[in-house]
Amino acid sequence: MKGFSRRRFLQASGSLVAIPAATSFLFSGCSLQGGTLKIAHNVRLTSWDPTTGLSSLDATAQSFYKAVFDSLITQHPDLSLSPGIVTDWGWSNDGSKIHLSLREDAFWHDGSQVTPDDVVWSLERAGSLTSDNPMRFIWSKITNFSISGNTVIADVKEYEPAIFKLMAYLTSYVLPKKAYTALGAEAWEKNPIGSGPYMLEKFEKNRFIRLKSFPQYWGPKPDFETVVIKMLPDAMDRVAELDSGDCDLAVNVPYEAFNRLSSSSKWEGQAYPIADVGMIFITNKEATMKDKNIRLAMHHAIDKQRLIDELLLGFGRPIDSMQVPGYDAYDPSIEIDFDPARARSYLSKAGYSKTNPVKLSIQTTRGYRPKDYEMIEMIVDMWREVGVEANIEVYSRTEHLKLRAQHKLAPAAFFNWSNSIGDPFS
């Protein structure tokens, strides 16, 4: 198994983009072993607790978390599972219990050993009714823990077929019981302790993270001794870092800049599609959005291929469901085509037309994903052609997550959605 390389920083990040392909650049002279790797990243980390709060649901923050912490189970880019902190797992014959066997060579960054008690405490904390863990509806199904040697055994209230996949997913990290309870939540943010390949050396909120290789890490030695992550939400700031030579690696590079930089021998560009979906969340805040005819009209009015060709310069692929190629539930027969005439017909059934349009608001980020705002501008123009008038409101990534948690999004809201385990229920 390879160490925690610059490629794994990309693959773990989830920051790789919605609908379009992921883009990144690596300085061609950057050593793949030892030294310091400097990354220009598009996300500002808001918390060092990977199991609670809004940031724990942010797929783009997972590269930071996976560098410092360990999930119960490890997942590879091809979605396969392999041992992490837990080396063996399974169900009882009747499907009422699970067992998790902990590796004996895992240590916390303070030098203490990772124990089965840490695993039990982490799962109990995650599933507590008072927990801020957004996945507690899953973790609360696991109860009545017992420990036998290095194995944790627990009851499962109801059969959850994806339980082990979820242990490689969001909020599934193991934290040190003794250290966390001694520090408390506030002090933890200044001195988080994990068991991952890197230790936190310095953190300046909204500015940068400096990580140092952990010599007692149970897995392969990381490729770099030190990693510095500059948090730069503005895409042009990341491009400027590349142009000035102040970083070795940048993610979520705008496509025009990608093509320009790719022509230089100084940089190695990578662009590839990933399972991070650009989507418009639809709410039922207004009566019009409860009408299926209106929702279908809005969908059939969008020319996805045109968005990809004209805005994304061909970097991306259209999809028609939340399941993407490679997921177990992917069904290629599901198609919702671009058909303006059909869209007008649906609107007519709902009592609307170009002269009597549906009116609504749509929220979008601006610069969080390449061409996110421009994409919504083009979609709004497409809607206008069939009889939907949409007013664009700009919000930040953090504002979206807060509004979504409070069920206060606008009737339509653009953001990315990612589910790396491919579970349809999740």
Where are each of the predicted segments found?
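N-terminal lobe/hinge region of extracytoplasmic solute-binding protein
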Residues: 41-93, 124, 193-194
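N-terminal export signals
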Residues: 8-29
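Ligand-site clamp/hinge motif
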Residues: 186, 214-260, 389
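Aromatic- and charge-enriched surface segment that lines or borders ligand/interaction sites
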Residues: 87-132, 153-155, 241, 288-290
